[in-house]
Amino acid sequence: MAIQKKHGKGRLDKWYKLAKEKGYRARAAFKLIQLNKKYGFLEKSKVLLDLCAAPGSWCQVAAEVMPVSSLIVGVDLAPIKPIPKVITFQSDITTEKCRATIRQHLKTWKADTVLHDGAPNVGTAWVQDSFNQAELTLQAMKLATEFLVEGGTFVTKVFRSKDYNSMLWVFNQLFKKVEATKPPSSRNVSAEIFVVCRGFKAPKRIDPKFLDPRAVFAELADPTPNNEAKVYKPEIKKRKRDGYEEGDYTQYKELPAYEFIQSTDPIAILGSTNRLSLEQSKNGDVALAVLEKLPETTDEIRTCCADLKVLGRKEFKLLLKWRLAVREKLGFPTKKSVKKEEEAAAAVAAAEEVAKIESMDEEMRIQHELEKLKERNSTKKKRERRKENERKQKDIVRMQMHMVAPMDIGVEQAGPEGEDAMFALRAVEKGDVMRRLAKGKMVVASEADAKKDRDSGIGSSGETDDESDEELDRLETELDDMYDQFRERKAASDAKYRAKKARQARNGDGDEEWEGVSDNEKADEISDDSELEEESSGDSDDEDDTAPRKSLLTDLDTTPSDNSGLSKRARAFFNQDIFKELDGDMDEPMDEELRAALAGEDEDADMEDTVSKADSKKTKEKTADKKAAKKAKKAAQKAQQVKDDDSDDESDGGFEVVKSGKEDDWEDEDKRTKDGRLDIDIITAEAMTLAHQLATGQKSSHDVIDDGFNKHAFKDREGLPEWFLDDETKHDKPQKPITKAAAAAIKEKMRAFNARPIKKVREAKGRKKMKAAQRLEKLKKKSDLLVNEEGMTEKEKAESIAKLLRKATKKKPKQAVKVVVAKGANRGIKGRPQGIKGRYKIVDPRMKKEMRALKRVAQKAKKRR
């Protein structure tokens, strides 16, 4: 009998003929060739595993393209004729025997690429065939996960079906890149596509459900329809075109109205039904006749029941109310009736419980009450704990949103000076309360006296009008600080502003960061729980006034204070070992002017320390310490001078102590140049205009001083908020005239300033000069060695030195740009191509055509000229 060939349309196409010409066993060989041309995975593979390889065309392509001495293993259920450089055997890939045979051939190797082009026996129902194909692909995937190396490639054939997305999800979990493609040699009428999975993740453990067809291809249950959204929000309802329901191809549902009345889920009926029928057929149901005759069934209800799909929220509510009214009239259970029944049942149960409790003995009753009290107490504690946690959470959120200062949360916590503190000792000592407490004769004030105190300006918590004013001042200060923080955050995105702040930080004149509310400010708040009155006589008052005042706060610094006039910081400085030798001399009588100078300097240091606490504690304290140390050192030097000059004379005469000038003089000295002139740079057109006028004699220094006295010079800015001052600074400022020559000079100055090279360029030039100097130094050392070499003639020495000079001055050849054509393995590549070092440029035919077109256009434009 003659062999029958398939002569269907598209079977004997050009790929079939090319396969015959080139000696491939099947036209499927060109599918692998085209896939490799696009992704280039065969050239990089040393070990390849081909599953379902019969008749062997993919193994033939792999043997041709892969490097020499590569290991290629092919397996199929059908026999495969021998192929050069390929190991083939016959087995079922779903069995353990096949897995053991593959492991025997690969030994310790791992496969770089796993191919799968298999298909099961088909011919039954299409749904079953597609599932069998997906199951076979999953089995191949299971085999690939065992033998594939990390970063390997898996290429498989997949038939598009409802299980395709589930399989693609599994691929994405195990591989870094997953792409689905259809090569040109694949027939268009075929549902097959090829999935190329690259970059195997090689997890240490894989969940068996990933490779179990029952778990991967399990059908998910349909979600419960949201009928409430259809009823209460019909305007935002979106239609999902999922096809028709099984057996319902008209998509039209009609139900009798009495089913809607009797249903326990009326919303589901309203969301899924098109019409509620009130029409009664001959010999029909009596319930519909009753509904029709009820007074609640109005014409509007009949109209709404005619078409439910066009109703809105209001009409649906009307139908639900109509249903409740009808159910109540017909005697059906409603929410009200059910609630009444539950209340009655609860009352009966409570009565029975009361009867049972009364029968208990006394001990049981007491125990029951104790348990109730414990339960109530634990409930109360839980509630308080929850409120406290909520308050803390709100504080943290406020701090994260920059609504409060970070120190606010710390101040609010329980502590010696916080809100939850039991005693405010500083406040007690500060006021007149401590003197009254020392007497011990106090009683609780009456309500009438408390009312008098409130009328006189003292609140229930002992807070007077002055304290309320202090509270307002504190709130204003906090508001100004919050405004400063807001301005900082708003201007932080401006590059000029950041540069300005950096300059200020380098110069040391930047604003310090606000560190929150001080504890000393919180100590002024007094909260008394009861009002006290004194019962002592006037005589005792007089006696107590003369008594020394006692303090509740103990100073931890127990260092005895001396009457030398020195502050604590200065005294601690003079206690160092370097000044011990001066102790004997210091006991001698010192000049009164010198003592006054030292005392004045210490007072200045203390005053600076007090001011520094209001602004910024840390930075100012360091500055004050340095200044105090300098002044103390100068005072010690002066004292030593006095001792040297007048060692025999103990009188107060002989020299005059002159106090040092202001700090501004020192600052001016820092700003002066080496030749004594002030370091001033003119950077604005107004300053340049004034400089021209002073230089040309148009203005004198007295004129400049007179111009300084204007309406802007004596503005009272004390007490004004910061936001108001910012607005005034922007808009209310004097407009000084400028000349054209001054503007041109500033412009030329800025042009020269901008023409300077950037910092990177200057650094590069500096590095270049430094390297050249280093090479020259090495060259000098080598030339000195050659000159001192005795075994060489003068000519040889000169030639060697000239050779060194040529080698040192020789420039490195510029590396040429390598051109890489974007085709084959380099098509669509991202990053550096493999095997390319140095500079490169990727080109393609499209770019070549565009370059030719540009040259052609340029030549045409040149001819027109």
Curated annotation (Swiss-Prot):
Entry's EC annotation: 2.1.1.-
Pfam families: DUF3381, FtsJ, Spb1_C
Record: active site: K157 (proton acceptor)
GO cellular component: nucleolus; preribosome, large subunit precursor
Keyword set, alphabetical order: Coiled coil, Methyltransferase, Nucleus, Ribosome biogenesis, rRNA processing, S-adenosyl-L-methionine, Transferase
Catalysed reactions, semicolon-separated: a ribonucleotide in rRNA + S-adenosyl-L-methionine = a 2'-O-methylribonucleotide in rRNA + S-adenosyl-L-homocysteine + H(+)
BP-aspect Gene Ontology terms: maturation of 5.8S rRNA from tricistronic rRNA transcript (SSU-rRNA, 5.8S rRNA, LSU-rRNA); maturation of LSU-rRNA from tricistronic rRNA transcript (SSU-rRNA, 5.8S rRNA, LSU-rRNA)
Molecular functions (GO terms): rRNA (guanosine-2'-O-)-methyltransferase activity; rRNA (uridine-2'-O-)-methyltransferase activity
Major localization class: nucleus
UniProt enzyme class: transferase
SUPFAM superfamilies: S-adenosyl-L-methionine-dependent methyltransferases
Listed Acidic residues bias regions: 463-483, 526-545, 600-609
UniProt feature, compositional bias: Basic and acidic residues: 386-396, 484-497, 610-627, 659-676
InterPro entries cross-referenced by the UniProt entry: RNA_methyltr_RlmE, RNA_MeTrfase_FtsJ_dom, rRNA-MeTfrase_E, rRNA_MeTfrase_SPB1-like_C, rRNA_MeTfrase_Spb1_DUF3381, SAM-dependent_MTases_sf, SPB1-like
Binding positions for S-adenosyl-L-methionine per the UniProt entry: G56, W58, D76, D92, D117
Ranges of biased composition (kind: Polar residues): 556-566
Family from the record: Belongs to the class I-like SAM-binding methyltransferase superfamily. RNA methyltransferase RlmE family. SPB1 subfamily.
Subunit text: Component of the nucleolar and nucleoplasmic pre-60S ribosomal particle.
Name this protein carries in UniProt: AdoMet-dependent rRNA methyltransferase SPB1
Provenance organism: Pyricularia oryzae (strain 70-15 / ATCC MYA-4617 / FGSC 8958) (Rice blast fungus)
